[in-house]
From Swiss-Prot:
One GO biological process term: negative regulation of DNA-templated transcription
A Pfam cross-reference name: ATP-cone
Listed name of the protein: Transcriptional repressor NrdR
Function: Negatively regulates transcription of bacterial ribonucleotide reductase nrd genes and operons by binding to NrdR-boxes.
Organism for this UniProt entry: Chlamydia muridarum (strain MoPn / Nigg)
NCBIfam families (alphabetical): transcriptional regulator NrdR
Length: 152
């Protein structure tokens, strides 16, 4: 690591502690040349491979997950903080799995699980895109399953 002020490579760690953010360590560092201090955050990087519908593999991209959640939850009572929390919960669920290869189907089901708890409109919007309904009957099944006791 280089000093962001003078690009010198010799630094010393002054303080280390757990960060309020999940799975991160916050470190205060000091450059041995210019004596400037700065903060770094260290996180564990665990790569999750996503198996796409066409058989390709792609690295998991949290930004794609967040964009999908934002699209489904726009104009609902779900705010930006809740979108971030849902994305974080889904990522933690994925990291908790033994297998580092996850299908888009598994990710979609997790998204639907969390959206169903958070907001039914967002859940239905996501289901319409994710499940690729072929006819109105399939949509009706989701709508009926989303209502308490299948009431009409």
């Amino acid at each position: 690591m280089l000093c962001p002020f003078c690009n010198h490579g010799e630094l010393k760690v002054i303080d280390s502690r757990n960060s309020p953010e999940a799975n991160a360590i916050k470190r205060r560092r000091e450059c041995l040349r210019c004596s400037q201090r700065f903060t770094t955050f260290e996180t564990v990087e665990l790569t999750i491979q996503v198996l796409k519908r066409d058989g390709r593999y792609e690295n998991f991209q949290e930004a794609k997950l967040i964009n999908g959640l934002k699209a489904a939850s726009s104009h609902t009572r779900i705010g930006q903080e809740q979108v971030q929390a849902i994305a974080s919960n889904i990522k933690q669920d994925l990291l908790g799995k033994q297998n580092r290869e996850i299908s888009t189907k598994e990710i979609g089901e997790l998204v639907m699980k969390y959206l169903k708890k958070a907001d039914m409109i967002a859940y239905i919007r996501f289901a319409c895109v994710y499940r690729r309904f072929r006819d109105v009957g399939e949509l009706m099944e989701v709508l009926l399953s989303a209502t308490p006791d299948g009431e009409k």
